[in-house]
Amino acid sequence: MKKIVIYPGTFDPVTYGHIDLIRRATEIFEHVIVAVVRHPQKSTLFSNKEREQMLKIATQGIPRMSIESFCGLLVNYVRRKKARVMVRGLRMISDFEYEFQMALTNRKLDPEIETIFMMPKESYCYLSSKLIKEVASLGANLKDFVLDFVEQKLKTALNKKSK
């Protein structure tokens, strides 16, 4: 049976940290499913379709991975995909408490599903989509945070939002 891992997230927008984690996960697992979360209660700057499209462009050339979206309970999605592992990024100690709580909740919901935490490269430890959106809204250059096309989409979306 193929070793599949699920990497869930909102990816609003996709960052160099996300791309780094995807690339490294494909070196460990036979197939990585990047699962874009559609969360009706969570407000995102980009639509689900836009987030998927940005991920497709950003991950071109990375083998053994696919991009899908899902809505609902993560453990149910993982089961449907016949996976037993999900991977989560831990940037800083501040991420740990939330991710630990989620991992334990998921384990309680399905003890067969494991959560693996991966650290990003040191140069990406501070990156978060939320921080990048904030910095972008103040007009900063984002070349160290996101790909050029993501920066352009981000600035366009923020300009539309501010009008």
Go through each PLM region and give its residues:
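Nucleotidyltransferase catalytic core that binds NTPs
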Residues: 1-163
